[in-house]
Design a protein with these regions (language model features):
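Short, compact, well-ordered microdomains
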Residues: 57-92
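Catalytic phosphate/metal-binding cores of nucleic-acid and nucleotide-processing enzymes, i.e., regions
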Residues: 1-52, 62, 68
């Protein structure tokens, strides 16, 4: 599938990845899109002085080959024009 189709899939809750990615086990998910009632004590938000209710806006996060989550993933030009995107449903 192309990136437009992959984007629609991830917006619907699937995890997406490219067949051609070298790092096996990598994938992208949609994260955020929810309201937090209060910052967790000790979190980066709390240390920045963010208090009260706030919204985490929807964004894309990458699980990289090392198993780390990288928030705010942005596709490369190659990713945008690739035709090797795949999607898998995730558990609810």
């Amino acid at each position: 599938m192309n990136f437009g189709q992959a984007l629609e899939a991830v917006k619907s809750g699937a995890k997406i990845y490219r067949e051609g990615w070298n790092g096996k086990g990598q994938f992208v998910i949609k994260a955020g899109g929810y309201t937090v009632s209060e910052s967790r004590p000790g979190s980066d938000y709390a240390r920045a002085g963010i208090v009260g209710e706030f919204t985490i806006q929807p964004h894309l996060d990458l699980k990289n080959a090392q198993g780390h989550m990288q928030p705010g993933w942005v596709p490369s030009q190659g990713d945008l024009f690739a035709e090797d995107w795949l999607a898998e449903p995730v558990a609810e």
